[in-house]
UniProtKB/Swiss-Prot annotation:
Pathway: tRNA modification; archaeosine-tRNA biosynthesis. It holds the Pfam family Radical_SAM. This is Archaeosine synthase subunit beta. It comes from the Archaea. InterPro entries: ELP3, Elp3/MiaA/NifB-like_rSAM, RaSEA, rSAM. Changing C51A: Loss of archaeosine formation. Its EC number is 4.3.2.-. It comes from Methanosarcina acetivorans (strain ATCC 35395 / DSM 2834 / JCM 12185 / C2A).
């Protein structure tokens, strides 16, 4: 069975409850480092017509495909979603807006151009919005739609975010089933740069079928490869989302989310190699069985140190906790490659 077929079979078994098309899938506020300054942010996950790649199977770890609308939202629906999300930032004097969907904001079959343009126009006219980021698969980036976005945003800074996950085409194909190549990303990033648009790259630590050590080596190599094209690199730590192939294998004891010690070591090495490149990681679900974790004693502290480092870029803020589980992690790195893919510890 192909990887895509395995993912698609799981998708087809999941029943998604209908939900209002005039409400975002999610929205929240936070703080990001933007041009070296800690900046308030509003993240909006728009409920869209759905990820085109996800409908055909999609990525092995992604449960966001279930966040799409039961029917394509209208222009009015999209504006209502934006209005509801913006209320969460009403007390901020200024903030950055980060736009996501269950797929790609620049896919015109997922988000109609008139809806895309209306959202950007609304944000352009709000003087509090200092920058706009949108996430998209690289194959939907064209000179035409980049120019269209810029013409609406006028002088407001614009950023494109890409879920590259890894610079390895083999891992992206055989572990993630992502459906595009590193060169697809390079072409999209170069198109963005041509028009003065900044680029954010998302990498993912420990997709399926990699040992802990292999996963660490992959991310360190991927940071080196993506650095020439990225203004910021954010490392997502794979977590176990419902209705995914990752979950199916995790339930069988054939997958363990990454150790938090792994991302600590990755960031130390990568920051030394790329001192001027902003590197960040938000350990979603840290400390839980489904999320990246060490032991119960140190997971919370180590996760907090990652969040602090993401804002300060100071390697001294990365946890140096002397926990007993650190020795276990080191032992995992030594011997896991010899256990034929079976995780040593849960």
């Amino acid at each position: 069975m192909s990887l895509n077929k395995a993912v698609l079979e799981i998708r087809q078994r999941i029943k998604v409850k209908p939900s209002p098309t005039n409400e975002p899938a999610a929205s929240w506020t936070g703080t990001d480092l933007v041009n070296g300054v800690q900046t308030k942010t509003l993240t909006v996950i728009f409920k869209s017509a759905g990820c085109r790649w996800g409908k055909a199977g999609g990525c092995t770890m992604c449960g966001y495909v279930y966040d799409c609308a039961s029917e394509p939202p209208s222009l009015e629906d999209y504006m209502a979603q934006l209005e509801k999300a913006m209320r969460k930032a009403e007390k901020f004097p200024e903030f950055m807006v980060k736009i996501f969907t269950s797929g790609s904001f620049l896919d015109e079959q997922e988000v109609l151009p008139e809806a895309r343009d209306a959202i950007l126009k609304n944000l352009t006219e709000d003087p509090r919005v200092t920058k706009v980021l949108v996430e998209t698969r690289p194959n939907y980036v064209t000179e035409e739609n980049v120019q269209a976005c810029l013409s609406i945003l006028k002088n407001k800074p614009f950023e494109l975010a890409f879920g590259l996950e890894t610079s390895s085409d083999k891992i992206r194909r055989d572990s993630i089933n992502k459906g595009f190549t590193f060169q697809d990303f390079v072409h999209a990033a170069e198109t963005a740069k041509k028009y003065g648009v900044t680029v954010k790259v998302y990498l993912m630590l420990k997709p399926l079928f990699l040992s802990e050590r292999q996963a660490m080596e992959d991310i360190i190599r991927s940071i080196d490869d993506a650095a020439p094209y990225a203004d910021t690199i954010s490392i997502n730590l794979c977590n176990v989302q419902k209705g995914t192939l990752v979950e199916a294998l995790w339930e069988k004891g054939q997958y363990r989310p990454p150790w938090l010690w792994s991302i600590i070591e990755i960031l130390r090495q990568a920051k030394a190699a790329h001192p001027e490149l902003p590197l960040m990681s938000d350990p979603v679900g840290a400390g839980s069985k489904r999320g990246p974790h060490n032991c119960k004693i140190c997971s919370s502290e180590v996760a907090d140190s990652l969040r602090t480092f993401s804002l300060t870029q100071n390697p001294a803020d990365l946890s140096t906790a002397d926990c007993e589980c650190k020795e276990l992690w080191k032992k995992v790195l030594e011997i896991e490659d010899f256990t034929y893919g079976t995780p040593i510890l849960d």
